[in-house]
Amino acid sequence: MQRINALTIAGTDPSGGAGIQADLKTFSALGAYGCSVITALVAQNTCGVQSVYRIEPDFVAAQLDSVFSDVRIDTTKIGMLAETDIVEAVAERLQRHHVRNVVLDTVMLAKSGDPLLSPSAIETLRVRLLPQVSLITPNLPEAAALLDAPHARTEQEMLAQGRALLAMGCEAVLMKGGHLEDAQSPDWLFTREGEQRFSAPRVNTKNTHGTGCTLSAALAALRPRHRCWGETANEAKAWLSAALAQADTLEVGKGIGPVHHFHAWW
């Protein structure tokens, strides 16, 4: 069987729980070979974001050229893009290199609430990037920002917003319902073929740093093995639930700790 080569385009996390570091751990845990393009150097830890150094857009583009000119990339995950010019650079290179099977994690805020995407970049993300990607994975605040609409408070409002996002041109939308006040944590998958609800009990842990990064990376790593996004999401969510269930066995940081990416091994 041909090995999967997976690319992550994202910012860093020195504490290892989110961003590029979480993506590469996820790829490895799920049997994919990980490549990376860095968009921002982020001084952050389990307590929050202290500082962000944005990489020059031309250098982001150069990194992408280096990878795509040499490595067969089977699947790509996009995370933190930080600002308008970086969004534009990534969108242009995806088009130039005819990149397919792209998962976009619409990263706007860190778990701590610190901003990771400038407000001016949201429109560029919406217009230039969304039509090129295969799947987006917004939580409810991110979906509201993309739609310039109020935050969904009910599952019915969540459904309406998911359908509106799908109409923007991407192949599929996985709306994450973790912000709903529900004992279950419902997610909804929207595709051209239909809609699918995923529900699982909330895992009782405070250590959820990097869950969005980890889920989107898992979706990217697993997609080439499955026939559709529904099958992919089922496996990715089950794997993430196990990583969350083992998060408390780690002892990382004083704040919101990471999930356990390698729970199957140690």
Q: What are the functions of these language-model segments?
A:
Residues 1-2, 8, 19, 183-198:
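Acidic-glycine-rich active-site phosphate/pyrophosphate-binding loop
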Residues 2-8, 28-111, 115, 262-265:
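Conserved N-terminal subdomain of the carbohydrate kinase-like
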Residues 144-145, 206-229:
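Short, small-residue alpha-helix embedded
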Residues 119-195, 235:
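Conserved phosphate/ATP/ADP-binding segment of small-molecule kinases
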Residues 9-15, 196-209:
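Short pre-catalytic strand/loop immediately N-terminal to key active-site residues, enriched for Gly-Thr
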Residues 30-35, 196, 222-236:
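Phosphate-handling active-site elements
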Residues 3, 54, 230-266:
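Charged C-terminal helix
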Residues 88-96, 163, 171, 194, ...:
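Nucleotide and nucleotide-moiety/phosphate-recognizing core
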